[in-house]
Amino acid sequence: MKVGDLKGRFFVVAHRGASGYEPENTLRAVRRALEMGVDAVEVDVRLSGDGVPVVIHDESVDRTTNGKGLVKSMSVEELRRLDAGKGERIPLLSEVLEEVKGKCVLFAELKEVGAAAPAFKIVEEMGMLDSVLFISFEQEALAAMKQLSPRSHVGLIYAKPSDGIVAAKHLGCEFVLPHYRLATEKAVAFAHRMGLTVVAWTVDDAETAAELKRRGVDGITSNYPDRILSLRKGNSG
């Protein structure tokens, strides 16, 4: 599936994989999401101490693994020795790409500006630029991605009331990802007028998801994607 295939239909994104059921940001969580039939999987990307893009949310490994320390102070080899839950390892970005290839879109959240170029290189080498949406709170990371290639698909995430929609348009984004509380009917309509696709995060109950769909949101990110997949019923094709 390509990023362009998400446009014009309602879609569901698995947050850090199906992280309500499996350890977040692991291949196990990604596979569970694929089994559910999601349209996209979102994962977090950082660099190891030796500059390899790995999939983990926090700056440190403390919360999600049995280890302690900063991701950037550990080599890939050291990171791979850790248990990220249920015996899973911290995946490489390349492993996640291999897992989703031909099955769904990948939302790769750049947790640091320095991850942009190495992540782009891997995605391009794997021939998956059309299947990956690079997203970030960091405008600089998205600007860097567009500079690396105008073909890169990018989306701006924001969690506070701001000029996020305007900023996204200026950055050359196709997507904007507001916290769901900021996805008001007015904001969604404005984003659509700017030609942006709106993805709200993170929603784990069907009632809130249905209300967001009513407001015109295009996609929803969830830790429990199976709870909201039924909202796709109105899609054509």
Tell me the role of every PLM-derived stretch.
Residues 1-237:
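Phosphate-group recognition and catalysis centered on beta-loop-alpha active-site segments
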